[in-house]
Regions:
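Cofactor-binding active-site loop characterized by glycine-rich and histidine/acidic residues
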Residues: 36-39, 46-170, 188-205
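Generic recognition of stable, solvent-exposed alpha-helical segments in well-folded globular domains
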Residues: 23, 33, 59, 162, ...
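Residue-level marker for buried hydrophobic side chains located in beta-strands
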Residues: 149, 176-177
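Conserved acidic/glycine
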Residues: 1-67
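Thiamine diphosphate
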Residues: 170, 177-228
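A generic alpha-helix structural signal
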Residues: 25-28, 64, 94, 164, ...
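Short, contiguous strand/loop micro-motifs
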Residues: 25, 150-151, 184-185
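Hydrophobic alpha-helical scaffolding
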Residues: 14, 24, 50, 84, ...
Length: 228
């Protein structure tokens, strides 16, 4: 049963200090305010097309950006906060949502395809889970720290598990983050499969934990992954 205290560690935030907390709040809050403005302008009709907001997950991205230094980034369709937290310029993101040529995908990718050469962020095509094997391939080629984020339904795609196995076999410097909201559109996990993502990862001898989306927990375990 998932809960707000899943995997919690007492007093963990104190181990990171005030500067980490301030940077975390600054990045997460900036993303939240940006997203609220996007929502407001979409409702008023200034933004056309689907909008994939990061509201509610901004501090996940903020924590990852503080724990990982200049990785290759392969996010999912909700990539606004990931882009902003890792230092992406908000103006090209704004312009992308407005469909302008000055957008980060030249105004043709839209909300789900956020990319930036400046922060090594690769856009998502919309194909469920495709970012995982792409991230593994890029990491294998460049041997550079890599981050990929995907949802709980994406891990069920048949090309994701082999990508995890390839990463383990080749000891690649890659961090996999599965953002699990227990839903694939409107279908609960228990109606889709009988196994847990963390068990799949552990079966491959990966360092893997099932935790709540607490930013200090995320940073703590990402540091553990890097150490291992």
């Amino acid at each position: 049963m998932r809960s707000p205290t899943l995997g919690a560690i007492d007093g963990l935030s104190e181990q990171f200090g005030n500067k980490f907390a301030l940077d975390l709040f600054t990045r997460g809050n900036f993303s939240r305010q940006f997203e609220l403005k996007v929502k407001e302008n979409a409702i008023e009709g200034y933004i056309n097309g689907p909008i994939y907001l990061s509201i509610g997950t901004e501090f996940n991205s903020a924590a990852l950006s503080l724990a990982l230094d200049n990785p290759l980034i392969f996010g999912q369709h909700r990539g606004h906060s990931l882009y902003l937290s890792f230092g992406g310029d908000p103006e090209p993101l704004r312009d992308e949502l407005l469909g302008l040529n000055s957008g980060c995908s030249y105004g043709v990718g839209g909300s789900c395809c956020i990319q930036s050469n400046e922060i090594n962020m690769f856009g998502h095509s919309g194909l469920l889970g495709e970012q995982v094997p792409l991230a593994v391939g890029a990491c294998f080629a460049k041997k550079q720290l890599t981050l990929t984020i995907f949802g709980d339904a994406a891990i069920e795609e048949d090309y994701v598990a082999p990508a995890l196995g390839w990463a383990v076999t080749n000891n690649l410097p890659i961090v996999f983050i599965c953002e699990d909201n227990d839903l694939s559109v409107l279908t609960k996990t228990e109606d889709r499969r009988s196994w847990r993502a963390v068990d799949l990862a552990n079966s491959l001898n990966m360092y893997a934990v099932d935790i709540t989306d607490d930013p200090w927990l995320i940073a703590y375990h990402v540091n553990k992954i890097r150490e291992s």
